[in-house]
């Protein structure tokens, strides 16, 4: 794929628009999807429960979430429940090309006559291609009679699709897209350029989409932060459900998923023995906890950085050192960022690292590490293998190994979280989509969380799938602790 005008035109086959790497990979992807379905009991249970009801009938869901095999099962669950779907990935490196092809072809189609879902995603997109694909996922064709039918739901991961709609509508209202700022990242410049180009051809596109959207469900910590910022500024134009803070998402996907996929990405990217290495992990939230646990399990000597004294104390009580980045960066063999914040590892930090030290990120965006400054620093980039780059500083001769250009290494260098843990997260996504679509009048333009009983429903499905057997409260026991026999069993403020 390139950024030529020809490449940035959707392919159309059998009436389906798409842009993927290779449709001939569909059979391979379908076999992988079928295996994942066996490991995703939550989604399969929801298909059985709601198939006859079709609660998402009429929903036109624009999705922006890593186009993996697991996401394919999510997409086909949404379709099975009545929705129409268009999809793009939320990361330039995270797409699994065989999964993207299989979703376009669909379970009953062929590469020559696809019958699936429009997907605009391939591994290794440029920034221009990435934002073009995001726009395609949000751009629905008119109905057969010519009536406009914009997207009416968003399923987001990181908030890019939501930001595209809300900022686009905001700039249309202002009558101008703001100029680039000298401090803007390369990606933000691409984002603004896309909005400028669209404003020249359609000055109401994003306003129409914004007015059509009934709600958004957001997958990640970073995207949720954006939603709260939009809401605080009065710019959130539709209701949002914070899926990330469902217990069966944050305490499972964020922790156990990262525990599995971080070392998978490091191993595939570098094949370096982790045991015995000094490893610095920045951030000890749920993602950091899972990351640290996996590294320590490999025999690494782990040090944590934290701003929050509570998280820092947790790390200390688990036996890890808690230090400042600048005090230990020169001793680390591997450095991992997991904060959801920006400028965690600066250019100065990178120059102070050991020769051939490994640097990677498992937070959502690439600005946790100052990649933009590294690119402008005069350091020499040598590609070692896909998504593994050696950066050499001419003034010292030292080099560092950067994984996935500072983006999610567990998806760029590996295949992300395993299916079972994603079944938890994606079950919450489906339930949240149903909630906003079927009960839209009950929600204002604010950020909500799913109620506790739905969180427990997701957990119960997966407990049973693993052969667990839940104890049943007696009526007297339930009354004694002030809960219903069938739950919810904990108050909303309970910390699991």
Swiss-Prot record:
Enzyme class per UniProt: hydrolase
Cofactor remark: Binds 1 NAD(+) per subunit.
GO biological process, one term: one-carbon metabolic process
Record keyword Cytoplasm present: yes
GO cellular component: cytosol
Superkingdom in the source lineage: Bacteria
UniProt keyword annotations, A-Z: Cytoplasm, Hydrolase, NAD, One-carbon metabolism
SUPFAM superfamilies, sorted: Formate/glycerate dehydrogenase catalytic domain-like, NAD(P)-binding Rossmann-fold domains
Needed cofactors: NAD(+)
This protein's name: Adenosylhomocysteinase
Function of the protein: May play a key role in the regulation of the intracellular concentration of adenosylhomocysteine.
GO function terms (MF aspect): adenosylhomocysteinase activity
Chain positions recorded as substrate binding sites: 68, 157, 219, 249, 253
Positions with a binding annotation for NAD(+): 220-222, 254, 283-288, 306, 341, 362-364, 410
Enzyme Commission number(s) from the entry: 3.13.2.1
Catalytic activity: S-adenosyl-L-homocysteine + H2O = L-homocysteine + adenosine
Subcellular localization, as worded in the UniProt entry: Cytoplasm
Pathway: Amino-acid biosynthesis; L-homocysteine biosynthesis; L-homocysteine from S-adenosyl-L-homocysteine: step 1/1
Principal subcellular localization: cytoplasm
Cited InterPro entries: Adenosylhomocyst_ase-like_sf, Adenosylhomocysteinase-like, Ado_hCys_hydrolase_NAD-bd, NAD(P)-bd_dom_sf, S-Ado-L-homoCys_hydrolase_CS
Disulfide bonds: none
């Amino acid at each position: 794929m390139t950024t030529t005008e020809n490449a940035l035109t959707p392919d159309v086959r059998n009436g389906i628009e798409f842009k993927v790497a290779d449709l001939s990979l569909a059979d391979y992807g379908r076999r992988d999807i079928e295996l994942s379905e066996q490991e995703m009991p939550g989604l399969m249970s929801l298909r059985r429960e709601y198939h006859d009801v079709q609660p998402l009938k009429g929903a036109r869901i624009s999705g922006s979430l890593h186009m993996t095999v697991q996401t394919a099962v999510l997409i086909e669950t949404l379709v099975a429940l009545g929705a129409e779907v268009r999809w793009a990935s939320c990361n330039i490196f995270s797409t699994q090309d065989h999964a993207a092809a299989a979703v376009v072809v669909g379970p009953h189609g062929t590469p020559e006559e696809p019958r699936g879902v429009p997907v605009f995603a391939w591994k290794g997109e440029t920034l221009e291609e990435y934002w073009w694909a995001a726009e395609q996922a949000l751009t629905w064709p008119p109905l057969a009679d010519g009536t406009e039918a914009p997207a009416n739901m968003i399923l987001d991961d990181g908030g890019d699709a939501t930001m595209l709609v809300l900022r686009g509508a905001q700039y249309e209202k202002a009558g101008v897209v703001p100029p680039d700022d000298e401090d803007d990242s390369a990606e933000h410049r691409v984002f603004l350029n896309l909005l400028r180009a669209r404003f020249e051809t359609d000055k109401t596109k994003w306003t129409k989409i914004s007015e059509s959207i009934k709600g958004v469900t957001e997958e990640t910590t970073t995207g949720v932060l954006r939603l709260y910022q939009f809401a605080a500024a009065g710019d959130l134009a539709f209701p949002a459900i914070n899926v990330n803070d469902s217990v069966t998402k944050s305490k499972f996907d964020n922790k156990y998923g990262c525990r599995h996929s971080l070392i998978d990405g490091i191993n595939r990217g570098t094949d370096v023995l982790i045991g015995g290495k000094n490893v610095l992990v920045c951030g000890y939230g749920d993602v950091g906890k899972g990351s640290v646990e996996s590294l320590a399990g490999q025999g690494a000597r782990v040090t944590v950085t934290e701003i929050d004294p509570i998280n820092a104390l947790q790390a200390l009580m688990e036996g890890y050192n808690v230090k400042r980045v600048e005090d230990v960066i020169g001793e680390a063999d591997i450095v991992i960022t997991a904060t959801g914040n920006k400028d965690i590892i600066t250019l100065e930090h990178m120059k102070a690292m050991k020769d051939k030290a490994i640097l990677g990120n498992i937070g959502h965006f690439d600005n946790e590490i100052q990649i933009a400054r590294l690119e402008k620093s005069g350091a020499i980039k040598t590609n070692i293998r896909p998504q593994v780059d050696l950066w050499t500083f001419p003034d010292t001769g030292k080099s560092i190994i950067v994984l996935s250009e500072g983006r999610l290494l567990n998806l760029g260098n590996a295949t992300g979280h395993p299916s079972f843990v994603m079944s938890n997260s994606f079950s919450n996504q489906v339930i949240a989509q149903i909630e906003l679509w079927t009960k839209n009048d009950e929600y204002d333009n604010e950020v909500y969380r799913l109620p506790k009983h739905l969180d427990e429903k997701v957990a119960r499905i997966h407990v049973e799938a693993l052969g667990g057997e839940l104890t049943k409260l007696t009526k007297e026991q339930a009354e004694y602790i002030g809960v219903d026999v069938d739950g919810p069993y904990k108050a909303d403020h309970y910390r699991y």
